[in-house]
Amino acid sequence: MSVIISKDNFKIIQYDNHIFTIEFASPCPALIHSLVNTKLILGATTTNDYQTVKFKAHTVKTLLQYQGEKTSPSIKTAHLLTSQLVTQLQYLLHENSTILGYHPENIIVINDQTFAFLGAEYVTHIYDEQIFISYPFSHADFFVSPELLKIKDLPSYVHYKTAYFSLACLVVYTLLGNHDFYDKYLQTHSSALDIMQNLDHHTIKHTKVYWLLSRSFIAEPEKRTILFI
């Protein structure tokens, strides 16, 4: 048995016979259901206390590790990641929950083909299409939406579709292989349109992923959608 990934709110342990467990620091039923009930992690089972998920796999790594191993960004990777994370997010939305923000360190990659969000500390409940922000966060914690950047006082509320913008940033990171676009966005407060311009000469243009990004990179959060068709 060995701990192969250790974060503040979860760790992944590898056992013999290709058995892995995800152990969360505290119960997170909504997030665990989004992994198991959607069959995102095939064959996964969970404990009654909603703190541990058990499954079989050959490899498990973070998205940051996965990207570091690749020689160049892949459209196929971006397509898989987008499809699977949208499925997970839509399940959470159905449960009246959402995700505050995404980061390559809170995404795991199973067998180089399954992508799952594990950042339990960023799963939050939706109240009348708003989410409650009660604690400070760093711009380095996750990809931050424009409305989160504007928060001056705590506690505060933002629209639940803040998650769509953050997910779109994660997809662009996967496509470009770096987060230079995000650093520029933070430094210059550039618009979502400016982020999309990073893809003007990319072969992703006019694909399903591209159109999802264009629907997610909208300044007014209530107008964003995550249709992946």
Q: Where on the chain are the PLM-derived regions?
A:
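Activation segment signature within eukaryotic-like protein kinase domains
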Residues: 81-82
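Protein kinase catalytic-loop region centered on the HRD/HxD motif
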Residues: 86-98
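Short, conserved alpha-helix in the C-lobe of eukaryotic-like protein kinase catalytic domains
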Residues: 166-178
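Conserved structural core of kinase catalytic domains
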Residues: 24, 36-76
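A conserved short helix/loop substructure at the end of the activation segment
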Residues: 217-228
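Activation segment/activation loop of eukaryotic-type protein kinase catalytic domains
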Residues: 103-143
